[in-house]
Amino acid sequence: MSTTIFQDGQPTLPAAGVGGGRCPDALLARYGQVLDGGRLNWTQYHNLGRRLGSGGQGVVFLTTRKGTDGFTLPVALKVFSPERYDSESAYSAAMERIARVSAQVAQIQQDNLLDVQNFVEQRQIRIMEMEWIDGYDLSRLLAPDLLEQTRERVSASRWEYLNNVIVTPGPRQSRLKPGVAIAIVRECLAALAALHRVNILHGDVKSSNIMVKRTGNAKIIDIGSAVTLATAPSHRTCTPAYAAPEVLEGRDHSPSSDLASLGYVLVEMLSGQPPFAGLTSFQDLLEAKRSL
């Protein structure tokens, strides 16, 4: 990690008539101590708010991170559940893997990837601090009840515009217009490319793991299933309807596996129905994916 350091040739100065007095020596000395100390530490407080979601890995809360002088910042906290692990050591090993991958993802700084801010523990339960995204996950945007609620709230002319340009009812859920769907996929591809360049696989690309912000931009979230190519465990979790055939069969994963999952999301957005709806048997699901 490297950052260019430079000396500002035009420093910010007080406006005319503002300040100008001498800083107290004691305050200036404390400033110097902070700069020269080599280490900083402080206590952070989070007020848990509403649940944003839950799944096999745990629960995500919207929280408020409190600083000093009245500073507050909305962030998301994911509390990782130990339920699926048969021992504390198994839970700890899995959390260490997630922490390592999360640290790598945090350094990528790609606009379409979730920003991971910290990974901590409370009573040996691991917690990931992430940016809070002001928007909806794609599965919610495709839900038919949301489209109906929108229809009830907008004017007839606005509804006509939405149907012509953005979204229409589909067979089982809402269907996005091709231009909108492609824009979402394009931004997800940028996020996946950033992961793949550093040999990380997301491992669970699906509509509920894609957030669409109120600005219209898409972000891939939930890196709890992400692994590095070099250290991928032999047994991994997946969402069967969105998993590539090789993932379902327990064979080696690759960047192509993530791309296949994103392809199923594209089919879902354009068709107006969940991918491979109605298929319950493992073999039927595999055959349907191979023939798509």
Each predicted region: which residue ranges?
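AlphaC helix of the eukaryotic protein kinase fold
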Residues: 88-107
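Activation-segment/catalytic-loop signature of the eukaryotic protein kinase fold
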Residues: 119
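Catalytic-loop of the protein kinase fold
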Residues: 196-212
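Conserved activation segment of eukaryotic-like protein kinases, specifically the C-terminal portion
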Residues: 233-247
